[in-house]
């Protein structure tokens, strides 16, 4: 009885702590999208959006929205370091990802995500890949959809706890220009609705 109560309280505490680790978490919002047909909402709203929507909301409501960011989960998570393969949960993100979500940077400048072939690693992933060596300036090979590129490690961020609403808890964050350059993805209003948008 007592042991079960301890487990139950621990689980409740974990559930109630979701997203509380974000800086000023009460002012962080996920952009949800509803699709209208003839003015009527079709189906359920989705947590996915198209790239320009969060920035357009921030521009339209400057007094309510301080900043916005967009990210996209990638399902090719295979990195090569010499002969070793690392499987890391990967997202691509823009330069405002860390400031909007309030994630802690250990080393590096989020503005580096404006350039191509850049990757930021979580502290745990950096340790897994490079041990006690400083990973900044080191390279990893990344394979996605038949393309290969060499990524330069330019930043380290604090590990994201398990109690997050993020669709994927990133262990590696790749810059949008990396994917856009190789795949020529449409990053505008015709980009499709597979992106996560956040407002602060």
Regions found by a protein language model. Give the residues of each.
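Short, flexible, glycine/charge-rich loop motifs used to bind or transfer phosphoryl groups or to couple energy/partner
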Residues: 18-19, 55-59, 88, 107-110, ...
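Generic hydrophobic, helix-prone segments enriched in Leu/Val/Ile
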Residues: 21, 61, 79-81, 90, ...
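Mid-to-C-terminal secondary-structure elements
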Residues: 94-107, 119-200
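Residue-level marker for well-ordered alpha-helical positions
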Residues: 51-55, 92, 99
